[in-house]
């Protein structure tokens, strides 16, 4: 499975709905993610992709849409 599909699957699980048609929607403005679910997202991404995404370095503006999460994960994978 490609990074995009795996990230969308993780997001769908955490958010509890299919977000595949909301790829540029802001999670935080829409209320789909809060601080607890953000930590869960980062931990799931670290585990799935063997990357480091420390909460202490989290910049909400870089992770606020599905497309941005995918781009960030791809950049961390190298």
UniProtKB/Swiss-Prot annotation:
Molecular function via GO: D-alanyl carrier activity
Cell location: Cytoplasm
O-(pantetheine 4'-phosphoryl)serine sites (modified residues): 35
Domain of life: Bacteria
Gene3D superfamilies membership: ACP-like
Coiled coil: none
First-listed, main subcellular location of the protein, grouped into a coarse class: cytoplasm
Pathway stated in the Swiss-Prot or TrEMBL entry: Cell wall biogenesis; lipoteichoic acid biosynthesis
InterPro entries per the UniProt record, alphabetical: ACP-like_sf, DltC, PP-bd_ACP
Domain Carrier: 1-77
Ranges that cross the membrane: none
GO CC aspect terms: cytoplasm
SUPFAM superfamilies: ACP-like
GO biological process: cell wall organization; lipoteichoic acid biosynthetic process
Signal sequence extent: none
PTM description: 4'-phosphopantetheine is transferred from CoA to a specific serine of apo-DCP.
Keywords, in A-Z order: Cell wall biogenesis/degradation, Cytoplasm, Phosphopantetheine, Phosphoprotein
Job of this protein: Carrier protein involved in the D-alanylation of lipoteichoic acid (LTA). The loading of thioester-linked D-alanine onto DltC is catalyzed by D-alanine--D-alanyl carrier protein ligase DltA. The DltC-carried D-alanyl group is further transferred to cell membrane phosphatidylglycerol (PG) by forming an ester bond, probably catalyzed by DltD. D-alanylation of LTA plays an important role in modulating the properties of the cell wall in Gram-positive bacteria, influencing the net charge of the cell wall.
Entry's family note: Belongs to the DltC family.
HAMAP family in alphabetical order: DltC
Protein name: D-alanyl carrier protein
Organism: Leuconostoc citreum (strain KM20)
Taxonomic placement: Bacteria, Bacillati, Bacillota, Bacilli, Lactobacillales
Gene: dltC
């Amino acid at each position: 499975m490609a990074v995009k599909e795996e990230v969308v699957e993780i997001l769908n699980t955490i958010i509890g709905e299919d977000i595949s048609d909301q790829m540029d929607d802001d999670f935080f403005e829409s209320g789909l993610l809060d601080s607890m679910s953000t930590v869960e997202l980062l931990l799931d991404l670290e585990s799935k992709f063997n990357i480091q995404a420390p909460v202490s370095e989290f910049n909400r503006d870089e992770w606020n849409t599905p497309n941005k999460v995918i781009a960030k994960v791809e950049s961390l994978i190298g």
